[in-house]
Each structure stands twice: as structure tokens, then as C-alpha cells.
């Protein structure tokens, strides 16, 4: 019982500390590639495509993040260890992932009407270039 209490308090303290928001280091644009799987037709054969893509991370509320990816916004709940999960109530879609150092991993799955789509994004944080005078 004590380890659970300590864990809960650590997460609560980290999320509630307005002056030291652990999410600040994760904000920005990540460049990488996506491994995309999509079932086609009734036989559910999968096509796999690799594409170069970007994903942008911004804050939402006290504990959330928004991932802007492929013209969609994915709202997630995050933990101070970098893991995040979907906040959606849609039973056909789910997403999760983690941010470790300057790397972001994002998994998305949508299953509806016999069609399945899975995306695995892996990216590195883009470093902004500044011109020094």
C-alpha cells in the first residue's frame, strides 16, 4: 500500500507543479518516419508504406498534450516518465506512445467497418536553427 501512495504522490506533485512543468522539454516538432499498415478488401491483406512525416507537440490543460499529426489533433494524457495514452472514448480508435530524450514514438490504430489502419511514428525532435550575428 505504501508504494502505491508514494507513486501517486510523485505523479500528482509533478503534474501539479506549475513552475516546473515536465512537459515543457517535450514541446516542439519531431521529424521522422511512419510505418503505415492498411488492410484492403475482404481478404485483409496488408500494404506497408514508409513515409517521412512530422508531428508537433503542444500542451493542453494541466496534464495533457496535443499531438498534431496528419491534419489531425490527438489529445493525450501524459505521465512524467514520458508515456502517454489516448483520451478518446471512441472504441474504434486508440493511440499511445512515449517521449524519451529527444525521441518520440507514437502508435495509432483505427479499426472500423472491417478496415484496419495502423501507424507507427518514430521521430527526433527538430532543433531550431538560429543565425548568430
Regions flagged by a language model, labelled:
Residues 1-17:
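Sec-dependent bacterial lipoprotein signal peptides
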Residues 15-31, 126-133:
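N-terminal helix-cap/turn-to-beta initiation motif at the start of protein domains
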Residues 23-65:
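Short, solvent-exposed loop/hinge segments that bridge or flank secondary-structure elements
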Residues 30, 99-108:
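A short hydrophobic beta-strand element
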Residues 35-38, 68-73, 110-113:
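Short, solvent-exposed aromatic-acidic interface loops
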Residues 48-51, 89-92, 115-122:
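Amphipathic hydrophobic-ligand
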Residues 54-101:
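Contiguous, well-ordered beta-strand patches that form the walls/edges
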Residues 80, 107-133:
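Edge beta-strand at a domain terminus
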Amino acid at each position: 500500500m505504501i508504494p502505491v501512495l508514494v507513486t501517486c504522490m510523485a505523479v500528482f506533485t509533478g503534474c501539479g507543479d506549475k513552475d516546473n512543468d515536465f512537459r515543457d522539454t517535450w514541446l516542439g516538432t519531431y521529424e521522422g518516419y511512419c510505418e503505415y499498415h492498411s488492410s484492403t478488401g475482404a481478404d485483409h491483406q496488408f500494404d506497408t508504406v514508409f513515409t517521412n512525416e512530422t508531428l508537433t507537440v503542444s500542451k493542453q490543460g494541466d496534464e495533457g498534450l496535443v499531438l498534431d499529426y496528419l491534419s489531425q489533433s490527438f489529445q493525450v494524457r501524459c505521465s512524467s516518465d514520458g508515456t502517454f495514452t489516448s483520451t478518446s472514448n471512441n472504441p474504434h480508435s486508440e493511440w499511445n506512445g512515449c517521449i524519451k530524450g529527444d525521441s518520440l514514438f507514437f502508435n495509432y490504430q483505427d479499426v472500423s467497418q472491417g478496415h484496419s489502419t495502423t501507424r507507427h511514428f518514430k521521430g527526433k525532435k527538430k532543433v531550431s536553427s538560429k543565425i548568430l550575428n
